[in-house]
Amino acid sequence: MQIFPAIDLKNGQCVRLFQGDFSKKTVVNEDPIAQAKAFATDGATYLHIVDLDGALEGRPINLEIIQRMKKAAKIPVQVGGGIRSMAQVDYYLESGIDRVIIGSAALTNPDFLRAAVQKYGAKIVAGIDAKNGFVATRGWLDVSQVSYLDLAKRMEKVGVETIIYTDISRDGTLTGPNLEQMANLKEHVKVSLIASGGVSSRADLEALAQLGLYGAIAGKALYNHDISMSDIVEVEQIAY
């Protein structure tokens, strides 16, 4: 299972949120470039980067920093946050970013998602962020009446190959991932699934790997030292 250390960017710094709440922000490193390099040095093979400013503004805000992070880390990166037009997708991918994550727009503008997938294939990752099973958009500020499973099925139909599923109620809480919802997704869609939200321990990563998922994202637990990069490297190499 591929495990992605997460770096969330706000005002040029690495931060962690609690349940997606921008008012509950903790700065974990003032230097995101050094953080990206440190993760790679310690064995990370792919980074998950979210431009929180971009998620709020609806346009790329931190691209220059992200490019410098990728250059320092020398490993692939996937980036999300405020990517709502083909011009923005082009902008990121032409600048050397490996994959882009389309979140809110996957629900609000499905034609855009379809066009992006047709143009870029596996370089497009769809993000589903849900609260109590219902999809949230616009930096998690708005909650829709669309269920996470319905949206996943729609995404599969338009050709999406990889979906990141975030349970907002668990994000940044260290309460464990939502294994039930991940298992439900695994049963009903045949895309590569990445779990996000709530990972608190090596045991959580092992439980997700045992579901047969493609990947998992580790954030707060890494910064709190509840999970080490050596844990991540070891779990990635275990065949479940």
Swiss-Prot record:
**Which keywords accompany this UniProt record?**
Amino-acid biosynthesis, Cytoplasm, Histidine biosynthesis, Isomerase
Entry GO CC = cytoplasm
Q: List the subcellular locations.
A: Cytoplasm
Enzyme class (EC, first level): isomerase
Q: What is its main location?
A: cytoplasm
Single GO molecular function: 1-(5-phosphoribosyl)-5-[(5-phosphoribosylamino)methylideneamino]imidazole-4-carboxamide isomerase activity
Which CDD domains does the UniProt record give?
A: HisA
Question: Which EC numbers does the record give?
Answer: 5.3.1.16
Which reactions are catalysed by this chain?
A: 1-(5-phospho-beta-D-ribosyl)-5-[(5-phospho-beta-D-ribosylamino)methylideneamino]imidazole-4-carboxamide = 5-[(5-phospho-1-deoxy-D-ribulos-1-ylimino)methylamino]-1-(5-phospho-beta-D-ribosyl)imidazole-4-carboxamide
- Which Gene Ontology BP annotations are present? L-histidine biosynthetic process; L-tryptophan biosynthetic process
Signal sequence interval, chain numbering = none
Q: Between which residues do disulfide bridges form?
A: none
Residue numbers annotated as active site: 8, 129
Pathway field of the UniProt record reads: Amino-acid biosynthesis; L-histidine biosynthesis; L-histidine from 5-phospho-alpha-D-ribose 1-diphosphate: step 4/9
Q: Which Pfam families match?
A: His_biosynth
Question: Which PANTHER family does the record cross-reference, listed alphabetically?
Answer: 1-(5-PHOSPHORIBOSYL)-5-[(5-PHOSPHORIBOSYLAMINO)METHYLIDENEAMINO] IMIDAZOLE-4-CARBOXAMIDE ISOMERASE (PTHR43090:SF2)
NCBIfam families (alphabetical): 1-(5-phosphoribosyl)-5-[(5-phosphoribosylamino)methylideneamino]imidazole-4-carboxamide isomerase
**Family membership:** Belongs to the HisA/HisF family.
- Tell me the protein's name: 1-(5-phosphoribosyl)-5-[(5-phosphoribosylamino)methylideneamino] imidazole-4-carboxamide isomerase
Q: Please give the organism.
A: Listeria monocytogenes serotype 4b (strain F2365)
